[in-house]
Amino acid sequence: MRRIALTTAAFILAVAGTSFAQGFIQYTSRADFFAVSFPGEPNVRETPWMSEQGITLPAHVYSVENERGRYSMTVVDYKDTEKLHTERAAQCVKAKGEGDACNNGWRGDVAGAIAWGTWQFLKRDAKVTFYGWYVADLVPGQWLQLLNPDGSRTFGAVNMHGTRLYLLEATVPRGAPAPGLFQQSLMFLDDEGRVIRYRSYYSPNHSDEWKFPAPPPPRAR
């Protein structure tokens, strides 16, 4: 009898899982080089993104909102960060700016992009119930969970790959299951739309796109 009960329970859970997965589609963005499972076809809109150091960058928001909750992916392109910072620094010098006001801080803006993206979650009017490091296909990032005042829960993840910052977010109603399928489905694509598989941890700050100079050898004091 116990074996039958366990089998029945397992069957019910399997059916529930299948039912929950129904309606999800694997969405691919060749423009922003990612793929993720959304609960329906997402709407896409352009939006400005203000970097930590005050540079306005282009971004796309892919979103679906239905009875399951609100699911979104925000992608910010940091490609022109160096150019924009250089132009701002030149204007500052021309205007006779003083001290550090005219520094070109583009490398810091890029290196701090994940932390800045994570801060957009942390500063909300919500209780942080989890915060930690994680990887998506060996691309490191930050992962967090929030409990909102209305009892809903927000699950967020922030990664950087190539020149783009990715902010994955799902908010589900009070009592709803965690959006595991959505969270675990993120993949990064190459220029030909193929899924990228790394053999070791990817480092966004030393990727081919940025070509940051290698640090000089350390010196003993």
Question: Across the structure, where does each feature detected by a protein language model lie?
Answer:
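Surface-exposed amphipathic alpha-helical segments
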Residues: 30, 42, 91-97, 101, ...
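Positively charged n-region of N-terminal signal peptides that target proteins for export
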Residues: 1-4
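Short N-terminal segments immediately surrounding and downstream of signal-peptide cleavage
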Residues: 22-41
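Short, solvent-exposed coil/turn segments at beta-strand boundaries
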Residues: 37-41, 66-68, 138-139, 159-166
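Sec/Tat signal peptide C-region and signal peptidase I cleavage site
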Residues: 17-21
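Conserved polar/disulfide-associated segments of primarily extracytoplasmic proteins
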Residues: 48-157, 221
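N-terminal leader/targeting segments
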Residues: 41, 46-47
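Bacterial N-terminal signal peptides
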Residues: 7-16
